[in-house]
Amino acid sequence: MLPEAREYLTRAGACFGTPIERLAQMNQPAIGIDCWWQTNVKGLFAVSEAAASHGVYRPGGTALNAGQVGSTRAAQYIAARCRGDASAGFDAAASAALAEMAALADVCRADTGNVRALWQHAAEEMSRCGAAIRDPAQIRAYGKQVEAQLADFAQTVKAGSRTELAMLYHLRDMLLSQRAYLTAMTDYTAHGGKSRGSALHTDLTGGVKPFGQLPDTFTFALDETENPLVQELWYEDGVCRTAWRARAPSPG
């Protein structure tokens, strides 16, 4: 083992026992969940951060399992085991949504589709500006692109097959999600948010570069305060809105 690797494991307290015993200490959930991410309260599912199984400092595989796999398995269980009477107004809301998506399919049908290229572009752009390295200027610029693409979605996105039509719906969901995340990131830095364990936010005015040869994007300042407020975001009338509120006290 390389000395650097041994030093890292030693400082992390990972040089003991068997691999299973060591892994059992990583990201232990604060809430008991089963293999379907259901808590000991029947019908209540806690996934990812809600179960404290997806923290700021985490290995990538754990994050994937906690977030994407956990939510998928919870949805599968709910669809198969938690059937019941629909709440009041569900049929009307579902009918309206189905009609909207059927109309979208009619408008976006074409002999040759472009949804794959648009999907690739959206994925690459989000990875470029909204992953671990976040430049506020790039986030704002791509956020405007996302807004424009959603506004002109029916006119600009085309599907040439059933497979591409499925991708078209996923692309729409992807862009809506990107709009929410980009709005939250922009609002975070606008309220003085700095770099933390999960992301480096470019700060060209009050930040420093750890190494001079790095691009200016790596200029940052650490968030050394504990913000008592929680950022909230919701979708209303086609717009992502944000607000900050005090944290709710812990029960008990």
Where are these regions (language model features)?
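Short, surface-exposed, charged/polar-biased interaction segments
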Residues: 65-68, 85, 92, 192
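Aromatic-residue detector
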Residues: 43, 48, 55-56, 70, ...
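Long, amphipathic alpha-helical stalk/connector segments used for oligomerization, subunit docking
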Residues: 82-162
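A conserved FAD-binding loop/helix module that cradles the flavin
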Residues: 53-78
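Mobile, glycine/GP-rich and aromatic-enriched active-site lid/loop segments adjacent to catalytic centers
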Residues: 1-59, 132-252
